[in-house]
């Protein structure tokens, strides 16, 4: 039998509304910046996720370039999701983001529509998911009009990703 979350996981964690949305964030989130790359130990990653969720931490925060190597944190967490957390997907708040270097060429970072949509599509593949709950633009782009960046994010939300 696989992982079974503690029944008491929601007994002590406090949750706060995320802005004016219907989402509620736990007081503590688990971020995967340099903790879940290929240089880490998979069993430790899995244990961290289990312990976090067993204590009411439902928000798991990633980015397309978290690792090292780029994308490896999403891939490793995607495997943990598949192994342990798919039965609990509706209880999880999974976020990822894009904006920093990810691949070579003029569309490998920043905030163009092309980069953001391609980044999210790649993130979803690595995570093994059809959607994320929050997709952030990681930083301002001095060369792309804000309207283009915001339009891309709006399109992503409307597409259900």
Pin down the residues of each PLM region.
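N-terminal binding-site loop/beta-alpha segment at the start of enzyme catalytic domains
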Residues: 1-92, 158
């Amino acid at each position: 039998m696989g992982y079974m979350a503690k029944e008491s996981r929601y007994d002590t964690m406090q949750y706060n509304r995320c802005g004016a949305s219907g989402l509620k964030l736990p007081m503590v989130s688990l971020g995967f910046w340099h903790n879940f790359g290929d240089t880490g130990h998979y069993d430790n990653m899995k244990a961290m996720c289990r312990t976090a969720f067993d204590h009411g931490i439902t928000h798991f925060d990633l980015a397309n370039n978290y690792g090292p190597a780029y994308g490896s944190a999403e891939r490793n967490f995607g495997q943990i999701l598949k192994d342990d957390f798919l039965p609990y997907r509706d209880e999880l708040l999974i976020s990822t983001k894009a904006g920093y270097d990810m691949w070579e060429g003029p569309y490998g970072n920043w905030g163009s529509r092309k980069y953001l949509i391609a980044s999210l599509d790649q993130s979803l593949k690595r995570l093994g998911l059809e959607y994320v709950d929050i997709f952030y633009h990681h930083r301002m782009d001095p060369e792309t009009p804000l309207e283009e960046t915001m339009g891309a994010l709006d399109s992503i939300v409307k597409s259900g990703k």
